[in-house]
Regions:
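Outer-membrane beta-barrel "beta-signal"
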Residues: 191-193, 197, 226-239
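Residues that define the transmembrane beta-barrel architecture of outer-membrane proteins
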Residues: 69-71, 86-90, 97-99, 116-120, ...
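Hydrophobic, well-structured mid-protein blocks that either form specific transmembrane helices
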Residues: 115-161
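Cleavable N-terminal export/targeting peptides
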Residues: 1-66
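Surface-exposed strand-loop-strand hairpins of Gram-negative outer-membrane beta-barrel proteins
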Residues: 60-67, 75-91
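Membrane-embedded beta-strand positions of outer-membrane beta-barrel proteins
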Residues: 73-79, 103-105, 136-140, 157, ...
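Short loop/turn motifs that connect adjacent beta-strands in outer-membrane beta-barrel proteins
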Residues: 61-71, 97-100, 129-135, 164-167, ...
């Protein structure tokens, strides 16, 4: 982790130098070329888009009886190990799903013999495309490195596939932060599989489901620091 922490320290110093530079910007008068008609057309397109999303969201929620997981709460406790550098990765997470939309929060903790590094990753909005038994998604959010007071924009792409009476789930995902002067803070490729082994009735048809999981994670920091983890843990779902 020493290389990652060193690069983050450089990022922090660049941020402080930039904020202390006192750069001023001159005023300029920019004439707008947008006409009333083009603005009206833009609002019309936006309105149609909103109507389409509302319609598809309604259709997705109507399928809840056949696919109850479309409105659900997920949690995960998992850990990974990278043998080459004796590094341990913890990534507990929680996610709420409501039709086409999800929000996900996770904490990531890296620990080796010399140091530890925490990040808080929040995918504020994930947009789901449910094509049962496949669900594709894309998300937008940020990752925060509290010890260095740094925050990066982060996006995600991925997909989930359910089979064997929807008890077996595979998921692949990609996450990446914005490009800064030092390159991308982090890129991540993750693949996991889990199988529901038991469930407990909570209320009416809602059940609390327990699924052991295994997986693999590849992470690259600042375009040059590679890490590979074998994962194990437990996923929890409520629907």
């Amino acid at each position: 982790l020493d290389d990652i922490n060193t690069e983050l320290e450089r990022q922090k110093k660049r941020k402080e130098e930039k904020s202390n530079s006192g750069t001023t910007y001159g005023n300029s008068s920019n004439s707008s070329s947008a006409s009333v008609n083009s603005l009206a057309a833009t609002f019309n397109v936006f309105g149609y888009l909103i109507q389409g999303i509302i319609f598809v969201q309604g259709e997705a929620l109507h399928s809840r009886k056949q696919h109850p997981e479309i409105v659900s709460l997920e949690g995960s406790f998992n850990a990974g190990y990278y043998k080459n550098f004796n590094t341990v990765l913890f990534t507990p997470r929680i996610q709420a799903n409501w039709g086409l939309f999800s929000t996900e929060f996770r904490e990531q903790r890296l620990t080796d013999a010399s140091a530890a590094l925490n990040t808080y990753d929040w995918q504020i909005l994930k947009f789901n495309i449910p094509i049962h038994p496949l669900t594709l998604y894309a998300g937008l959010g940020f990752t925060n490195v509290p010890i260095y007071k740094l925050t990066y924009f982060e996006y995600s792409l991925g997909g989930k596939l359910r089979f064997l009476k929807e008890k077996f789930l595979t998921e692949g995902s990609y996450r990446s932060t914005e490009i800064s002067n030092g390159g991308r803070f982090r890129q991540e490729y993750r693949f996991t599989i889990d199988y529901e082994v038991t469930s407990y009735k909570v209320k009416n048809n809602t059940r609390f489901r327990i699924s052991p999981m295994i997986g693999f994670v590849y992470q690259k920091y600042f375009n040059r620091i590679n890490q590979y983890y074998i994962l194990g843990g437990v996923n929890f779902r409520l629907f």
